Amino acid sequence: MKQFNMDAFRENLRECRLQAGLTMQQLADKINVRYLSIYRWETGKRSPALVHVVAIAEALGMSLPELLGIAVEEEDNGY
């Protein structure tokens, strides 16, 4: 199992939020948290709960592995 990379998450969160054209407040409104939560997650002062990570991925239209900075390897099924 791949390890969660908080630094990659922080960077991906900020980069993808900006690419989506969202302010911290707009993303906070989409996932029903306070602006300060987004700020703390992006600066690494706090780590989000899993429910918030899922909500962020959905709000930004990306997969959890992408958001978390986890490389997903395709399995070789021998076909």
Q: What is the predicted function of each stretch?
A:
Residues 1-19:
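A short, Lys/Arg-rich alpha-helix, primarily the initiator
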Residues 1-3, 58, 68-79:
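Short, charged recognition helix plus adjacent turn
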